[in-house]
Amino acid sequence: MLDLVIIGAGPAGISAAYEAKQHGLSYIVIEKGLIGNTIYNYPVGLTVFSTINELEINEGELKPAREKPTREELLSYYVRFVLEHDLNIRTEETVTGVLSEPPALAGGKVDAPKSTFIETRTDSNVTSEPPAYAGGSDRFTVTTDKGVYHSTNVLFALGSMDYPRKLNVKGEEFPKVYDHFRETYPWVKKRALIVGGGNSAGEAALFLAQEGADTTLAIFRGDWENNDPKQGCIKYWVKQPLENELKENCLKLFFLGKVIEIREGEVELESEIGERVVLPNDVVFVLIGSDADLTMLKNLGVETTQGKGGEVPVYDPETFETNVRGIYVAGHFTNQRHIKGAIDAPKVLIPLLKKKLTAKNAKEAK
């Protein structure tokens, strides 16, 4: 019986594994992809414009060649960190189910609900009452495509890339339509359309324009004019180069009303004022965000709500425990939308979990 199963080996999962090892917990990390899989899926050569202390797990360890690290440097740092600290991470293993063991089998007592777990927001502030536990046994069975694990606690340390959002228009199923952007070189001198209003869409448009693609960014005017980082604007270090590309006629901007249809060799768009335009086209990147897969959490009884970037699990912001006792959450699929928040959450969560386990073991020993 493990103390903790961690699902996901991104910054949150790596940080949690490190803290678990430092605090003497028995644990395992299960990752369906690679170490730092979300970062691996960043565009090739991307510069990560966060400050170094927001990206590193321990201060002073990340040493990029320039002021900001590239995707490759950040990925290498996380992989090196895992290897140097001999963290127990299993990659390319997919979790297929998480079940709460029946109390009769686990020998645990189910607490009656104490109160309703309420999470309210005032701007960026989050306040909450302690969670009302939805039963459970404090013991869980985690099933993967390669084995079965038993643990008293489970931490979902997930990203939010499971379900890319769709336009739901005719022609979106064509092979030339992508829901992610990796690199520019296949699209040099091609007619590229990027649909989206966030940083990912802005970066893709910038890279393609700089590398010689005939590039059009289709964006809502409100998204283009938005300068509020809290509202998901295109960051200034992407926006300024985009404006330069516009001035040099290397990039075209289309203020979007909606996408009408994607066809072989062209795309039909409707402008913000209702005019329809047909653009010659070779490739379309639909970069309008993505959502996490919350199915397993919901099956366990975890409550969800609408967060900053979509549906998120409800959790205590002080302990990161959900309304289901023993189920914790951290990472980009929560309201911690940045890497620093994902890294810092386990630094709070794991010491509290250690304290809880120590008290429980002492009680059982009497």
What is the meaning of each model-derived region?
Residues 5-7, 149-161, 195, 280-289:
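Short hydrophobic core segments
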Residues 11-87, 206-236, 305-311:
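Beta1-alpha1 glycine-rich phosphate/pyrophosphate-binding loop at the start
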Residues 70-101, 108, 136-162, 260-266:
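Feature captures the FAD/FMN-dependent oxidoreductase FAD-binding
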Residues 86-99, 139-142, 212-307:
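A Rossmann-like FAD-binding core segment of flavoenzymes
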Residues 135, 358-366:
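Short, low-complexity, charge-dense intrinsically disordered segments
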Residues 158-211, 308-318:
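Glycine-rich dinucleotide-binding loop and its adjacent helix/turn
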Residues 173-186, 290-338:
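FAD-site-proximal beta/loop scaffold in flavoenzymes
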Residues 330-357:
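A conserved FAD-binding loop/helix module that cradles the flavin
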